[in-house]
């Protein structure tokens, strides 16, 4: 439900603009020290009109993962890999548990900064979107 709620909110927000959101069927191509790999984030947003591939994205500006609290390996591994994407401005991790709501935003500003929201509003600066934690779990 969390993924669907956020995906619908982002699609509505981005409609008619230069950015486009994709759900988990679109993979992201990541090159780490010459080693190419692919990941399937839950939601990915690109603003690059020159994306030339139908099945994967090379220039994401926002990546969202919906994770269980037990998915520490995913959190660490994916964040370490995603940091190598030069166009990535924000990496967002959202807890799937309604009893433990949490939105963690890793934002690149010269270096990566982290902020965590368990209630109230959160902003995805890369796409100018503001939402509430409660709406994700509604």
Map each language-model feature to its residues.
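Gly/Pro/Ser/Thr-rich low-complexity, intrinsically disordered segments predominantly at protein N-termini
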Residues: 1-138
């Amino acid at each position: 439900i969390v993924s669907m709620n956020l995906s619908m909110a982002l699609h509505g927000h981005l409609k008619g603009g230069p950015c486009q959101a994709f759900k988990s069927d679109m993979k992201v191509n990541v090159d780490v020290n010459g080693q190419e790999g692919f990941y399937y984030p839950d939601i990915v947003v690109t603003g690059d009109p020159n994306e030339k591939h139908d099945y994967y994205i090379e220039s994401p500006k926002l990546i969202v993962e919906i994770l269980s609290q037990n998915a520490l390996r995913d959190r660490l591994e994916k964040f370490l890999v995603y940091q190598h994407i030069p166009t990535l401005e924000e990496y967002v991790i959202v807890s799937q548990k309604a009893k433990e709501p949490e939105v963690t935003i890793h934002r690149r500003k010269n270096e990566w900064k982290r902020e965590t929201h368990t209630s109230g509003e959160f902003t995805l600066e890369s796409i100018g979107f503001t939402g509430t934690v409660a709406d994700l779990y509604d």
